[in-house]
Amino acid sequence: MVKNSFIPVLSQEKKGKNPGLVEFQIFQFTNRIRRLTSHFELHPKDYSSQTGLRKILGKRQRLLSYLSKKDGIQYKKLINQFDIRQSQIR
């Protein structure tokens, strides 16, 4: 498994940007989530990593909620770009 193969185009665009930006943090969490989900295909009983995945999902959801309130246009753009399902609770 190659770590950086999930979102290679986006990582090239984001290299020069501030890692404190909400968009960049969502990008990093999305990358980690995709890596962990591929990890679970090989190791389905890795429960400690599943707990970590749930924490990351919660953090990303809170950031997405913040971004939707702050800048709805950027939120929709980010959702489409990363293929993230839109939150049911808004």
From Swiss-Prot:
Q: Which family does it belong to?
A: Belongs to the universal ribosomal protein uS15 family.
What binding partners and quaternary form does the record give?
A: Part of the 30S ribosomal subunit.
Q: Which organism is it from?
A: Phaseolus vulgaris
What Pfam families does the record tag this protein with?
Ribosomal_S15
A GO molecular-function annotation = structural constituent of ribosome
| Intracellular or extracellular location(s) | Plastid, Chloroplast
Keyword annotations for this protein, in alphabetical order, are: Chloroplast, Plastid, Ribonucleoprotein, Ribosomal protein
Name the cystine pairs: none
TM annotation in the entry:
none
Q: Gene3D superfamilies, alphabetically?
A: S15/NS1, RNA-binding
Residues of the signal sequence? none
Q: Which SMART domains match?
A: Ribosomal_S15 (SM01387)
What GO cellular component entries does it have? chloroplast; ribonucleoprotein complex; ribosome
GO BP: any one term: translation
Question: Which protein are we looking at?
Answer: Small ribosomal subunit protein uS15c
Q: Does the keyword Ribosomal protein apply?
A: yes
